């Protein structure tokens, strides 16, 4: 849409009036409402709209006969048939303008359909690959990270872990790195070069977890993805299908696991309804007898991660303050300087104590991880643990 709008804006004569077109085709129509397409697509649709007859019948101006245009929409979205039924029921003939923040629903309303909408559905009865195994892990919010870590330890290979937000990707990257998991990230805030580099490393690493937002849900073809984890439940069934489609490709087997919190139950039931999974997804079997030990390990890793972030922010603030004083060339008396040096000394001692404690916690975490991997079935309160 952006390229076409650029051409129409350049003054090319035969592109100034598109009202005479007999065919209008939108491919991957569900992607047309993603960020970056709203404005240009709205302009193109406006160029296609035919003038409406005036309300005043006495007006002498005659309008040209309307063009019998056929409109084709191609989409993988599961909601398209339902939207078509609703539009046919309402028989909306006056289009609504497409604005920023538009959804698939408003796009359908923005296009003028002169005749009833017909839907041709080529989708299979199964919406996901036939060799894709689907499962769920029911967990409390406090146990979610521990169950994810246990899953990653039980199932080796390449895994893609999907999150709904970049902040969740960043948090999990720090946590899983402390837990000695080989992790990479792929999210919308990364430059294209960094994304390609991450994908290349992921392809070349046999045992690795790729933390990703939905930027990786479409168009990502990586051979040998063993399983997909929906760490946060996707916002729609379409996204779930696209995410899960990163594994079980080209007739290969694969696994998609959804982590379900109590707050997700409503969305989960809606997802199962749209996937035609009346009885819900089966539970994934994990050695939950190991969960108490894993929770203690993950809890310690969280403490280390939180302390590290606090210290990093304090260090950045101190560096910024020193740079500001230096740039402004602020004078200070000997007394103030002495006070600053005394305070700085106390701060350094406190900082050294925190660093020593942090180092001790990291050693303790490494020992807990080693002992757990050597004997995962040992009880939580044993001396070996």
Provide a role label for each language-model segment:
Residues 147, 158, 167-217:
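Conserved helicase ATPase core of P-loop NTP-dependent helicases/translocases
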Residues 13-26, 30-121:
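Post-DEXD/H (motif II) to motif III coupling segment of the RecA-like Helicase ATP-binding lobe
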Residues 28-32, 169, 215-216, 233, ...:
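Conserved Walker B
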Residues 1-17:
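Conserved RecA-like ASCE ATPase "motif II neighborhood" in helicase/translocase motors
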Residues 173, 206, 210-228, 242-252:
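SF2 helicase motor core recognition
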Residues 50, 59-68, 83-87, 92, ...:
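Arginine-glycine-biased low-complexity disordered regions
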Residues 126-178:
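Conserved interdomain hinge at the start of the Helicase C-terminal
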Residues 1-3, 28, 73-78, 123, ...:
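A short beta-strand-to-loop transition that corresponds to the Sensor-1 phosphate-sensing loop
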């Amino acid at each position: 849409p952006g390229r076409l709008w650029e051409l129409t804006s350049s003054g090319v004569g035969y592109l100034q009036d598109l009202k005479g077109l007999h065919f209008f085709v939108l491919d991957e129509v569900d992607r047309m409402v993603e960020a970056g397409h709203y404005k240009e697509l709205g302009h193109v649709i406006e160029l296609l709209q035919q003038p409406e007859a005036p309300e005043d019948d006495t007006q002498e101006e005659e309008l040209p006969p309307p063009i019998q245009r056929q409109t084709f929409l191609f989409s993988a979205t599961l909601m398209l048939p339902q939207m078509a039924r609703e539009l046919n029921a309402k028989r909306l003939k006056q289009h609504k303008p497409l604005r920023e923040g538009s959804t698939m629903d408003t796009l359908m309303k923005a296009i003028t359909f002169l005749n009833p909408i017909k839907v041709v559905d080529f989708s299979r009865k199964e919406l996901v690959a036939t060799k894709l195994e689907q499962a769920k892990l029911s967990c409390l919010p406090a146990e979610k990270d521990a169950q994810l870590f246990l899953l990653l330890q039980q199932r080796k290979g390449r895994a893609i872990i999907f999150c709904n937000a970049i902040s969740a990707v960043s948090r999990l990257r720090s946590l899983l790195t402390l837990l000695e998991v080989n992790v990479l990230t792929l999210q919308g805030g990364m430059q294209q070069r960094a994304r390609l580099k991450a994908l290349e490393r992921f392809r070349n690493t046999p045992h690795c977890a790729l933390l990703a937002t939905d930027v990786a849900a479409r168009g990502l073809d990586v051979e040998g993805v063993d399983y997909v984890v929906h760490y946060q439940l996707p916002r729609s069934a379409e996204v779930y299908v696209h995410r899960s489609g990163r594994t079980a490709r080209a007739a290969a087997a694969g696994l998609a696991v959804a982590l379900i919190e109590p707050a997700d139950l409503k969305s989960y039931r809606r997802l199962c309804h749209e996937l035609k999974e009346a009885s819900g997804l089966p539970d994934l079997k994990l050695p939950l007898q190991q969960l108490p030990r894993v929770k203690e390990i993950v809890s310690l890793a969280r403490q280390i991660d939180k302390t590290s972030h606090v210290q990093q922010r304090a260090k950045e603030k101190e560096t910024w303050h020193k740079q500001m004083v230096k740039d402004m060339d602020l004078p200070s008396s000997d007394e103030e300087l002495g006070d600053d040096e005394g305070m700085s000394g106390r701060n350094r001692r406190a900082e050294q104590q925190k660093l020593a404690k942090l180092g001790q916690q990291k050693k303790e975490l490494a020992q807990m991880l080693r002992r757990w991997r050597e004997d995962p079935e040992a009880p939580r309160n044993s001396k070996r643990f």
